[in-house]
Amino acid sequence: FENLYFSPMISVAHESLTTTANASANYKKQEGSYLDALFNYSLTYDQRNSPYRPTEGYVSTILQEIPLVSEGYSIINGYQIKGYKEIVNDSVLSVGLYTQAITSLKTNTDVRVSKRLFLPESKLRGFKSGKVGPKDGADYVGGNYMASLNTALSLPFLFPTLDKVDFAVF
């Protein structure tokens, strides 16, 4: 299995959620202490011609977070793929798709507010981190599903003599 990478990880975390008097009912009902033991893994298939500044190929990753011991029992599934194609004169077009979903495994139970999903800054430009998506009152609470489609075009001919400058349009 050439260019196929399996990355497992086990993590244990303790979390204490506290709220204020003006918190919403959804926040207040999730107040308390939580202990999670999780098994995370990713499976990556890399067909790029180079891991650093690729010009051709793609990299595809499936990821999952499975609760081993948890008071919330939520599972995260995700998939991302990014492709690269040289257009002309060392200009490289990249297109990437990023998706994730979190699902509560307990019947009629919401996903814990601290486990909700937010798009990473690298996937969503022009917005404050954590300030996009569903709101509960004045608070951004993240979502159970997320997806982004990103494109970028590298233009190395703008600074041909500078080795340490990257320029991309996205």
Describe these PLM feature segments.
Residues 8, 12-165, 169-170:
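C-terminal outer-membrane beta-barrel translocator/porin domains of Gram-negative envelope proteins
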